[in-house]
Design a protein with these regions (language model features):
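Acidic/polar helix N-cap motif
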Residues: 1-2, 29, 149-152
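Acidic catalytic patch
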Residues: 4-13
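Short, acidic loop-to-helix structural element flanking the phosphoryl-transfer center
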Residues: 18-46, 52-56
Length: 161
């Protein structure tokens, strides 16, 4: 990573940790998705490009930490990691709690990297219609499924094997 780029990443992370995560808002309907999955006995994990501790702090801030069995972050030893590596870490953590079959899992995300990361491990991919993706981001990658809102996402996840 170029020194100037590395400095910018460090500055962004510092601001995000200090104030940015507290300025964020939850996508309306996401808590209902998590409640529905919990009621169905589904184990939920998080695979994020954010550093693991930032992700945990964000989950704590929103009162969601207890809904995620595993959290895999994007920084290990200070080096950037691909989404495939992060998903691999999440899968390894899930295996530690007895969940070992990627074909019975789904990677839900708003960016093409989420789809690529899930596909790299044989995980069903679901692209969501909110978040940071550009309108044409899915054009050439073809996730297995797409959901336009949290209600559709929950119904879709419930329909998977």
């Amino acid at each position: 990573m170029e020194p100037l780029h590395a400095d910018a990443v460090l500055a962004f992370r510092a601001r995000h940790t200090a104030t940015g995560l507290f300025e964020a808002t939850l996508i309306p309907g996401i808590e209902a998705v998590l409640d529905g999955l919990a009621a169905d006995g589904v184990t939920v994990g998080l695979a994020t490009a954010k550093p693991t501790e930032q992700a945990r702090t964000t989950l704590d801030h929103f009162g969601l930490a207890d809904r995620f069995a595993v959290v895999a972050g994007g920084v290990a030893d200070g080096l950037p990691r691909s989404k495939a590596m992060i998903v691999g870490d999440a899968l390894a953590q899930l295996a530690e709690v007895g969940l070992r079959d990627p074909s019975r899992m789904a990677m839900v995300g708003d960016r093409r990297h989420d789809v690529e990361g899930g596909r790299a491990h044989g995980v069903t991919t679901v692209a969501v219609g909110w978040g940071y993706a550009q309108p044409d981001e899915w054009a050439d990658i073809e996730p297995h499924h797409q959901a336009t809102d949290p209600v559709e996402l929950l119904a879709l996840l419930r329909s998977l094997p």
